[in-house]
């Protein structure tokens, strides 16, 4: 009996007759030979149908079968040094499983809106396939890293009665007889987890009702948010850079084929595994920007041009430390010798991708935190449980958040964050 295999396992079956379930992505043919571009979800490769070596029925089927038709392919695996994948199948038999008439995404250039309208089908194409495989590796690597580091995975609620970031950019819904919101962050709940279990991380969807159309913003995105008890900011920075380097190395080790499809330079990625990452203060960043003709004043948050310059200046991810208190959320710990900055850091990625991590040491003083909640215009009653964490055995603790899609945009060198999530939710798009 002929063994059924996945395309990705072709290397283990050279010169063997196998059976593969696949879809046709493209084809070309002459009078004597037909070339079928095939995919099965595990990889892409070529099927070669030689007229003199198959029945007339099989050769005619190879010429007539339509794009994205599904079929069983039987044939012999051979090495193919001309392709990135390295293998092909010499086809002996074809059985069509599912027809595909007038597939809308033809092998030509299509506009962004057209491809987003057909995202459910565009996911089948090579570039989205490669990105989603890298996404899967980053998720796998996240669990491996934090398990090795002794963290517990904790699930934070998606429906909340308060806003962790202290903003009004919330999706509102009714929760029986009161208001509720879709979560902007799991951080506050992760802090409770850290004081219970020592080290925790949350990983789940978050929602920001930001009316932004930039290439770096999604309405719905996924966040990894670790929190660590008995830990100060410098220790947290060390965890952060180890985590990033671990993820990048995992992509290099396990996603070479996907990186080849994307044309991503592995040597560039290797630079990002070298630790430690540079650290500069916000004050130093302002001076560096001014020296290079940026019109910036102390107290402003950095935009994309400033973040791009700073990271590219070091040609590495760079930590910018201790931002002004006025532009950061209420829960950050004040600086011990200055009342105008907080103990925090953003990690900026090079190549124009900007902030991928935001983190801080958390405020531990009950009265200070209560005052900050009031100054942010928030209702202290909504945060009574959070304030309790400072009443009963408060300890130094720190944490950070990494936006999965922003990280992936950098690693895959994509132009827009929408390409790194299967079904992006944008300001004017909630379909499909």
From Swiss-Prot:
Keywords: Aminoacyl-tRNA synthetase, ATP-binding, Cytoplasm, Ligase, Nucleotide-binding, Protein biosynthesis. GO terms for cellular component: cytoplasm. GO terms for biological process: asparaginyl-tRNA aminoacylation. Its EC number is 6.1.1.22. It is found in: Cytoplasm. It catalyses: tRNA(Asn) + L-asparagine + ATP = L-asparaginyl-tRNA(Asn) + AMP + diphosphate + H(+). It comes from the Bacteria. The keyword Protein biosynthesis applies. Pfam families: tRNA-synt_2, tRNA_anti-codon. Its main location: cytoplasm. InterPro entries: Aa-tRNA-synt_II (IPR004364), aa-tRNA-synth_II (IPR006195), aa-tRNA-synth_II/BPL/LPL (IPR045864), Asn-tRNA-ligase (IPR004522), Asp/Asn-tRNA-synth_IIb (IPR002312), NA-bd_OB-fold (IPR012340), NA-bd_OB_tRNA (IPR004365). CDD domains: AsnRS_cyto_like_N, AsxRS_core. Gene3D superfamilies: Bira Bifunctional Protein, Domain 2 (3.30.930.10), Nucleic acid-binding proteins (2.40.50.140). One of its GO terms (molecular function) is ATP binding. NCBIfam families: asnS (TIGR00457), PRK03932.1 (NF003037). PANTHER family: ASPARAGINE--TRNA LIGASE, MITOCHONDRIAL-RELATED (PTHR22594:SF34), ASPARTYL/LYSYL-TRNA SYNTHETASE (PTHR22594). Homodimer. Belongs to the class-II aminoacyl-tRNA synthetase family. This is Asparagine--tRNA ligase 2. It comes from Lactiplantibacillus plantarum (strain ATCC BAA-793 / NCIMB 8826 / WCFS1).
């Amino acid at each position: 009996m002929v063994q059924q295999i996945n395309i990705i396992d072709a290397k283990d079956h050279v010169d063997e007759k196998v059976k593969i379930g696949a879809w046709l992505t493209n084809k070309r043919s002459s009078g004597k030979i037909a070339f079928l571009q095939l995919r099965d979800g595990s990889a892409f490769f070529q099927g070669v149908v030689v007229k003199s070596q198959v029945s007339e029925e099989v050769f005619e089927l190879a010429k007539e079968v339509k794009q994205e038709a599904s079929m069983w392919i039987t044939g012999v695996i051979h090495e193919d040094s001309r392709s990135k994948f390295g293998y092909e199948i010499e086809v002996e038999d074809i059985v069509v499983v599912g027809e595909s008439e007038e597939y809308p995404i033809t092998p030509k250039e299509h506009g962004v809106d057209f491809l987003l309208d057909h995202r459910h089908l565009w996911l089948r194409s090579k570039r989205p396939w490669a990105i989603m495989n890298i996404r899967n590796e980053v998720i796998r690597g996240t669990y491996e890293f934090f398990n090795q580091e002794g963290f517990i995975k904790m699930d934070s609620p998606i429906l909340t009665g308060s806003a962790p970031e202290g903003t009004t950019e919330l999706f509102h819904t009714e929760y029986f007889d009161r208001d509720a919101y879709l979560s902007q962050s799991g951080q506050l709940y992760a802090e409770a987890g850290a004081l219970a279990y020592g080290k925790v991380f949350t990983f789940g969807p978050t929602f920001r009702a930001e009316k932004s159309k930039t290439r770096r913003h999604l309405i719905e995105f996924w966040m990894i948010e670790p929190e660590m008890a008995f830990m100060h900011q410098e220790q947290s920075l060390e965890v952060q850079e180890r985590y990033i380097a671990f993820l990048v190395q995992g992509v290099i080790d396990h996603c070479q084929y996907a990186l080849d499809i994307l044309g991503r330079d592995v040597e560039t990625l290797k630079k990002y595994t070298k630790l430690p990452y540079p650290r500069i203060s916000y004050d130093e960043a302002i001076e560096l920007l001014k020296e290079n003709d940026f019109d910036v004043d102390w107290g402003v948050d950095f935009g994309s041009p400033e973040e791009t310059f700073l990271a590219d200046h070091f040609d590495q991810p760079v930590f910018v430390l201790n931002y002004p208190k006025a532009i950061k959320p209420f829960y950050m710990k004040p600086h011990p010798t200055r009342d105008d900055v907080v103990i925090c850091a953003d990690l900026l990625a090079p190549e124009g991708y900007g902030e991928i991590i935001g983190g801080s040491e958390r405020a531990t003083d009950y009265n200070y935190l209560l005052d900050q909640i009031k100054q942010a215009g928030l209702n202290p009653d909504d945060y009574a449980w959070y304030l309790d964490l400072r009443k009963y055995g408060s300890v130094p603790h720190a944490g950070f958040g990494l936006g999965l899609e922003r990280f992936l945009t950098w690693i895959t060198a994509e132009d827009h964050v929408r390409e790194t999530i299967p079904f992006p939710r944008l300001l004017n798009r909630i379909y499909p």
